[in-house]
Each structure stands twice: as C-alpha cells, then as structure tokens.
Amino acid sequence: MMKDLDKLAVAIIGSGNIGTDLMIKVLRHAKHLDVAAMVGIDPASDGLARAARLGVPTTAGGIDGLVAMPGFADVRIAFDATSAGAHARHAEVLGRHGVQVIDLTPAAIGPFVVPVVNLFEHLDAPNLNMVTCGGQATIPIVHAVSRVAPVHYAEIVASISSRSAGPGTRANIDEFTETTSKAIETVGGAARGKAIIVLNPAEPPLMMRDTVYCLTDEDADTAAIEHSIRTMVDAVASYVPGYRLKQAVQFDRYTAAQPLAFDAGERRAGLKVSVFLEVEGAAHYLPSYAGNLDIMTSAALAAAEQIAASRVAA
C-alpha cells in the first residue's frame, strides 16, 4: 500500500545481494520512492528476513507471489535484480499490469540507460535496462570523450573482486560482455566497443577497478577531452560517491608510421585516451570493495528517483 502521496510504490524482485542493497538504499535515501514489496524465491534468504525486520512486505513466491500481494495494485515501478534468464517472464507479467521496470540484469529487453548520459530520453520507457556494473562505470567516460571528439574504438576492462561476484554475476558473464559492448556503442557513442571482465581472486579483496581506452583522432584536443572526463566523473560521483579517477588521464599519440595495434591486430593512427577508475562501495549492505554491485544499485536508484520526481511533479 502506498504510504505517501508524494512517493511512488516500488517492488524489488530478487532478495540477493543487489536486491537487498537496493532496498536499504531506497529506505535510507529515496525522496520519492516507497518500498511496497521485497520479492524472492528462497524463504530462508537473508534479504527477505532483513526486509521483514524493516517492515517491508515480503513474498518468497517470485513474480506470481508479487502479483498476489494485497499492495501490488499500488506498485508503479519494479526493480528486477534477478538474472537475465528470469527477466523475460518478469517483464512480460509486469508489462501486462502497467508496471514500469528497471532491469538490473543484462537481459537488455528495454533501452540501455546510464543516468548521467541518457536517462531523460527514456523516463517513460516501460522497461529500462541498467546495462552492467562495468557499463555504468565506463560508459560515462566513453561518452565524455565522444561528446568532444570522435571515438573510433573503445575498450573497457572491468576488474572486480571474486568475492563480490555471486552466482548471478558468474552465470551472466557472456551477457555482461555482449551487453556492455553494445552499450559502449549505442550509449557511449563509440563506433566500435569491446568489454572485458576480470574476476580478481586477490585477498584481501580489491575494490572495483575499471580501465577505459578510447581511440580518437590524432589531432584531438587533449585539454577538452580531459575537462570533459573530469566533469563526467563529478557527475557520476553525485550519485555514486565512491566513484573516482585513480590517476591522471593519459594520452598517447600514434602516427601512420607507427600506428596503434588493437582489436585482433587492426592498426590505426590516432590519439589513445587511457582512463583509470576506482569504485568504492557505500557499504550499505555490501562490503566497500563491492563497488561493482554498489554502482548498479546507485544507478538504479538514481533512475527511479528521477522517474518518480517527474511523475510527482506532474
């Protein structure tokens, strides 16, 4: 049941690490959202138990259990924090009931959304896909370069702690690379994109690290590129406080006589831009090294807050 006329009722599907962290973020920080349901499939999950302790209505009956809940009619937005495979049915069921979906899986049924880049283009989309953790961290940087210089090729490497990669993340590795690569192009603005994910087994666990390489024109303006990148980092940090540059932006020029070799041996002259990022989690529910999960929940919350704010204002 909706508790506040200035808030939209939301449901969170998936009571694992991502869903539980998202629930805590909404409860603590959301101005326009009210958690109406936490949905899982394991009655013994910590996420459902924690939700119940916090007074959030719960069901272990999955999507069908959600639809059967007394407060479901009030739900306007549903976050799906399950898996790409499960999302198709969830999207179909929720769509029938007119519930807008924010998809935190790599299913990519709806348009790719990175809040600082293109959220306002998709506020009314029935299904918004939040790409991947690597996408949320790196696509803003690709876009920052592409808005001041053409990006002929962009490659990102997302390195995350093995301990932060649960069964859902591990099951979706292929979807991660495919979805992120596409979004580097369609959202980031690169002519071609490539994504790589590395699960780092180091102990103690390391924070999420992301490397972004962009190949642009040889005579591109380095000062304009660096300014655009730093402005973008500040914009992302406004909703992911642990997001930061790890070191200065690096530039390397390659001439026709000494071209850059990349992506299966292709060679090209140009300016290579290298950006090194670190993402520290807020440690609401997950440990601080799990920045890869924190950036997903933070981006999803930012998207939902803006959607809700636009509806409340209307």
Swiss-Prot record:
The keyword tRNA-binding does not apply. It is an enzyme of class 1 (oxidoreductase). GO terms for biological process: catabolic process. Its EC number is 1.2.1.10. One of its GO terms (molecular function) is NAD binding. The active site is at 133 (acyl-thioester intermediate). It catalyses: acetaldehyde + NAD(+) + CoA = acetyl-CoA + NADH + H(+). Keywords: Aromatic hydrocarbons catabolism, NAD, Oxidoreductase. Coiled coil: none annotated. NAD(+) binds at residues 15-18, 164-172, 292. It comes from the Bacteria. The keyword Ribosomal protein does not apply. Belongs to the acetaldehyde dehydrogenase family. This is Acetaldehyde dehydrogenase 4.
